[in-house]
């Protein structure tokens, strides 16, 4: 009976990690596609030029793919080394997430101020020929979220000139609508709009976070169960 349950657990873990691996492959593909596209998803931060959406998706996809592969191979081959590696990687990811979450809440005010200042510094690169992606990214977020600048529309004045904002800041977009006109532009800054979006979707994001946490804990539990069984028997059990 116990042997049958462990065999069932073995293949459940394999199937779960196979899906996990396929998701990682999908994320990696999306990240590569974004990196070779027109640069619409470039980084907003000049301090972290590599911190773009494409690079983040590539890194996450790679980690998910490698972790899923270790889980699949460790389960189907009943390999203690691979199962232990799978467990350690999940543990490191879990601890990293918890540490980053704690640090974020402890230093929230400082993080907000530094992020705002860094984004404002990034606005200075808006018209740079080597940063077309950043320009496209700002145009997209301002048009989609109905916002202008980082804290408000005046953030653009040092960049584009007095009383001048990008045309995508206009409530009704038209050619040169952002020149010498501030009455018909979005007044709310994009930083505040993004915070509002997170606040409006906190329940959904919280649910997703809890699902990820449960998946990680289950993966660790399954891998250790198989590891301990193989260690106790000193040999593989037949499927």
Swiss-Prot record:
Keywords: Glycoprotein, Membrane, Transmembrane, Transmembrane helix. One of its GO terms (cellular component) is plasma membrane. It is found in: Membrane. The keyword Transmembrane helix applies. Residues 1-13, 77-85, 225-239 are cytoplasmic. The chain crosses the membrane at residues 14-34, 56-76, 86-106, 204-224. It holds the Pfam family Tetraspanin. Glycans are attached at residue 180. InterPro entries: Tetraspanin/Peripherin (IPR018499), Tetraspanin_animals (IPR000301), Tetraspanin_CS (IPR018503), Tetraspanin_EC2_sf (IPR008952). It is a multi-pass membrane protein. CDD domains: NET-5_like_LEL (cd03165). It comes from the Eukaryota. Disulfide bonds: none annotated. Residues 35-55, 107-203 are extracellular. Gene3D superfamilies: Tetraspanin (1.10.1450.10). Belongs to the tetraspanin (TM4SF) family. This is Tetraspanin-9. It comes from Xenopus laevis (African clawed frog). The gene is tspan9.
């Amino acid at each position: 009976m116990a042997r049958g349950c462990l065999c069932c657990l073995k293949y459940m873990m394999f199937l779960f990690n196979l899906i996990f691996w396929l998701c990682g492959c999908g994320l990696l593909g999306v990240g590569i596609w974004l990196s070779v596209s027109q640069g619409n998803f470039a980084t907003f931060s000049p301090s972290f030029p590599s911190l773009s959406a494409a690079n983040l998706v590539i890194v996450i996809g790679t980690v998910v793919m490698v972790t899923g592969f270790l889980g699949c191979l460790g389960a189907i081959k009943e390999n203690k080394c691979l199962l232990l590696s799978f467990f350690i990687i999940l543990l490191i990811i879990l601890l990293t997430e918890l540490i980053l979450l704690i640090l974020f809440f402890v230093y929230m005010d400082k993080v907000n101020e530094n992020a705002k200042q860094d984004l404002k510094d990034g606005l200075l690169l808006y018209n740079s020929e080597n940063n077309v992606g950043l320009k496209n990214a700002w145009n997209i977020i301002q048009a989609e979220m109905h916002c202008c600048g980082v804290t408000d529309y005046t953030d653009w004045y040092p960049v584009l000139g007095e009383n001048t904002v990008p045309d995508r800041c206009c409530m009704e977009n038209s050619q040169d609508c952002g020149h010498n006109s501030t009455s018909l532009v979005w007044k709310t800054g994009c930083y505040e709009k993004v915070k509002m979006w997170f606040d409006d979707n906190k329940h959904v994001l919280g649910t997703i976070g809890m699902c990820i946490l449960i998946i990680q804990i289950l993966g660790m539990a399954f891998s250790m169960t198989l590891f301990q069984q193989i260690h106790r028997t000193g040999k593989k059990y037949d499927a």
